[in-house]
């Protein structure tokens, strides 16, 4: 007889995020990505598809989305925005499937983290190319590159602070990453990559200042 699969439990599969004040009102991960991701999980739950396979699929779709943003045609930019939304949904579904089936592993969590960071770098870099293609403004595009460098520094500081705290979590919350990705999707659909450039410049700088302030106020010798 075929092995009976327990029904999919959505509440058990959803990861509890870190509720920053802004996420109470702009939690696109909770209200958009997770419900759509749950549909994906329900479809693949009875199959042999693994969480890691969904992680790879999310990454590949994200890479294609970034490539679309680099093309100087409006239709491809819109397609890139739609593909990025799909990548976000799949990125929500992989962890949900792992928790639902009890297949969570250190390798899977690390794989997801590594591919997320690579995907973020490609996505943010492609938006700079998209802005330059749309406007020809090299000055703000160069400023966007500075913002991208600041983003990488922001991520490095995040992991250093979390390592110092000996925190068990391995990456930024899904809600935070989803909000940043959603801003890219909205700006791409609206054709406002200029706003996105300013966000890429100002947000990492503000986050770096916050991380340094936060680290300064941590206990000198955490348990």
Which role does the model predict for each range below?
Residues 48, 68-72, 190, 217:
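Helix-loop junctions at the membrane-solvent interface of multi-pass transporters
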Residues 51-107:
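Membrane-embedded alpha-helical segments that form the functional core of polytopic membrane enzymes
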Residues 43, 84-87, 105, 109, ...:
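A generic hydrophobic-helix recognition signal that picks specific residues
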């Amino acid at each position: 007889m075929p092995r009976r699969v327990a029904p999919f439990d959505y509440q058990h599969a959803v990861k509890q995020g870190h509720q920053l004040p802004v996420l109470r009102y702009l939690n696109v991960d909770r209200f958009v990505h997770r419900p759509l991701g749950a549909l994906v999980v329900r479809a693949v739950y009875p199959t042999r598809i693994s969480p890691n396979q969904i992680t790879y699929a999310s990454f590949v779709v994200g890479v294609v989305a970034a490539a679309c943003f680099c093309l100087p045609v409006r239709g491809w930019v819109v397609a890139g925005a739609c593909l990025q939304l799909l990548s976000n949904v799949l990125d929500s579904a992989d962890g949900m499937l792992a928790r639902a089936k009890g297949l969570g592993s250190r390798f899977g969590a690390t794989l997801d983290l590594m591919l997320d960071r690579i995907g973020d770098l490609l996505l943010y870099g492609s938006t700079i190319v998209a802005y330059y293609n749309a406007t020809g403004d090299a000055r703000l595009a160069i400023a966007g590159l500075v913002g991208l460098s600041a983003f990488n520094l922001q991520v490095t500081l995040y992991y250093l602070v979390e390592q110092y705290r000996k925190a068990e979590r391995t990456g930024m919350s899904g809600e935070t990453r989803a909000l940043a990705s959603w801003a890219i999707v909205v700006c791409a659909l609206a054709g406002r990559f200029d706003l996105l450039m300013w966000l890429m410049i100002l947000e990492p700088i503000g986050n770096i200042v916050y991380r340094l302030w936060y680290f300064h106020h941590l206990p000198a010798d955490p348990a």
